[in-house]
Regions:
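Sec/Tat signal peptide C-region and signal peptidase I cleavage site
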Residues: 20-24
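Structural motif corresponding to the early beta-alpha repeats
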Residues: 61-67, 79-109, 135-136
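Bacterial N-terminal signal peptides that target proteins for export
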Residues: 2-10
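Active-site cleft segment of glycoside hydrolase catalytic domains centered on the general acid/base Glu
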Residues: 44-47, 71-78, 103-204, 211-230, ...
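Bacterial N-terminal signal peptides
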Residues: 10-18
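Substrate-binding cleft of secreted/luminal carbohydrate-active enzymes
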Residues: 245, 249-314
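Boundary/entry segment of secreted carbohydrate-active catalytic domains
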Residues: 25-66
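Hydrophobic faces of well-ordered beta-strands that scaffold small-molecule active sites
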Residues: 34-40, 61-63, 93-97, 131-135, ...
Length: 314
């Protein structure tokens, strides 16, 4: 009797797993079975990097572009070159798009329409390579929302973006808004999302956030909150750990990355991007400079092997 019960339970769990994985592939058609990628910077992302990223077991790359720089020919070429590097290794792209300059607070509708046009142009150019377009990055931080006054400026702008985008059928999934912290009960991001999603329920395919410093249980709770409140899946568009001595140095970084990848695989997160492939010499402090799986010169750190081991473990 117990054996039959266990078999039924095993069958049910297998079916649930199949549904979850089917959901992931339906959500992001250009994403292969594996759903973990890594962030790169367009200014120094090379064909060689792409080959090593693919060999390590990552299934996509994430990089960002600035909508208000896209009119410059040199910048257009830099973006095109980054896509070409990714294509050389068969790596699709999670493309994060935001503006650098403050938006005109007295004309957010026009600004939203203009931003939507930039998104549509990128989608038209690169849809065959896109995992998804991520709309904005950490707007809940003033650094990345220079317009300021998030509570009063974010929703009008994003509603204008969604209104402009609804006129054409999307060929690429859209995720938003790369929050620095996941939405929680009563938070500014939850209030904003509730208004946007109720007004434009088809604007986004998933809610993205950055769970730095969060435990697996906290991430699981965030996923549940997002699904229950917005009826959309949650995805992790950025997470990393710096190789500071306070984190255990290079070995501590490696251990924490291995644990994180194991956790998101177990939690069946539909998409996760690790920050980042190489150290950033341009970081503003030691913490910001040492998130890479490789040194800035391209030498592997222990974190690269730790990530590859987890990524290639079924």
């Amino acid at each position: 009797m117990k054996s039959a019960h266990l078999k039924r339970l095993a069958s049910a769990l297998l079916a649930l797993s199949a549904v979850t994985h089917a959901h992931a592939s339906e959500l992001f058609p250009n994403l292969p079975a594996k759903t973990i990628g890594v962030q790169v910077k367009i200014q120094n992302f090379t064909v060689e990097d792409a080959a090593h990223i693919k060999a390590a077991g990552f299934s996509f790359v994430r990089f960002g572009v600035w909508s208000d720089s896209l009119s410059a020919k040199a910048y257009q070429q830099q973006v095109s070159d980054a896509f070409a590097a990714a294509r050389s290794a068969g790596l699709p792209v999670l493309l994060t798009v935001r503006a650098l300059k403050p938006l005109p607070a007295n004309d957010l509708a026009t600004a939203g329409e203009s931003f939507a046009n930039a998104l549509a142009g990128l989608e038209k150019s690169y849809s065959a390579q896109l995992v998804a377009i991520e709309i904005w990055n950490e707007p809940d931080l003033d650094t990345y929302w220079p317009t300021r006054n998030f509570d009063t400026t974010f929703v009008p702008f994003m509603n204008a973006v969604c209104k402009s985008l609804q006129g054409t059928a999307p060929t690429t999934p859209r995720v938003g808004y790369g929050f620095a912290r996941p939405p929680t009960a009563g938070s500014a991001s939850t209030v904003a999302l509730s208004r946007i999603v109720s007004e434009y329920p088809k604007c986004l395919n998933a809610i993205s956030y950055h769970p730095y410093g969060m435990t697996a249980t906290q991430i699981s709770n965030a996923q549940t909150f997002i699904q229950q409140n917005f009826h959309l899946p949650g995805v992790i568009s950025e997470w990393g750990i710096s190789a500071l001595s306070s984190n255990g140095g290079n070995d501590g970084q490696a251990s924490k990355i291995a644990s994180f990848i194991a956790d998101v695989k177990r939690l069946n997160i539909p998409l996760t991007s690790i920050y980042e492939w190489k150290n950033s010499d341009t970081g503003s402090n030691d913490r910001e400079k040492n998130f890479g799986l490789l040194t800035s010169g391209g030498q592997p750190k222990p974190a690269k092997l730790a990530a590859a081991t987890q990524l290639n473990t079924q």
